[in-house]
Amino acid sequence: MSADGDHGFTFGYMTLRGEDGSVRLAKYLTYWLRTPQGWRAAAYKRMGRPEGEVSLALMPPSLPAQRLAPNDDSSVVAGHRRTLIAAEQAFSDEAQRIGIGPAFRRNGRDDAVNGGGEAGFTIGAEAISRAVGDGSATSPVSWGADDALVASSGDLGITFGVIRPNGPPPEGRPAAFAFFTIWRRESPDEPWRYVAE
């Protein structure tokens, strides 16, 4: 939840049952905006998940230290948006310099979640960095944000962009694919860190 109470995100597990009796396991991540009509999904991602045990225990909520009134100054929100788009680009640039695993370690939060390829979510920047490429001195991909939404309080936001391989894609893989990343910071004076993807 953002400090202004107007942005939030959820993630979890689902079981999809087809009319033919088939069962598919999945994970989801949703970014929400509060509107006069209620909460509405601004971004939604459903990922398949393999069989396996998953913890259904609730994580502590990712909440701001204090509640703030929404800020109606569009120039302030535009400034927050610019810093968030720049943070996403800096994350990719750092991955090119130090490797994708170390960049995920440096740019994430201890309470970050990643959908990944396991049955459950990977929790924490350290574990996520190991899952995506620990020890790798390079990055197989580069990316950047084309757009972003940011709470008026400047502490929660989401970036949207495209990931591209740094070389020819493996046979049968797309040359580029869309992504979104959810970011949090304690205050507008602090650096952005990814919290969910």
Predicted regions and their residues:
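Glycine-rich beta-strand-turn "strand-cap" elements at beta-sheet edges
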Residues: 1-3, 43-65, 115, 139-154, ...
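Short, low-complexity N-terminal intrinsically disordered segments enriched in polar/charged residues
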Residues: 42, 50-106
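A mature extracytoplasmic/lumenal domain signature
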Residues: 12-14, 30, 45-46, 108, ...
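A short, structured loop/turn motif at beta-sheet edges
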Residues: 1-7, 33-38, 150-157, 184-190
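Sec-exported extracytoplasmic/periplasmic mature domains
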Residues: 34, 89-97, 109, 113, ...
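Short beta-strand edge/turn micro-motifs at domain boundaries
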Residues: 25-62, 176-197
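Hydrophobic/aromatic beta-strand elements that line small-molecule binding cavities or substrate pockets
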Residues: 1, 13-16, 27-33, 145-150, ...
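A solvent-exposed, acidic/Ser-Thr-rich amphipathic alpha-helical stretch
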Residues: 1-6, 21, 101-153, 170-174
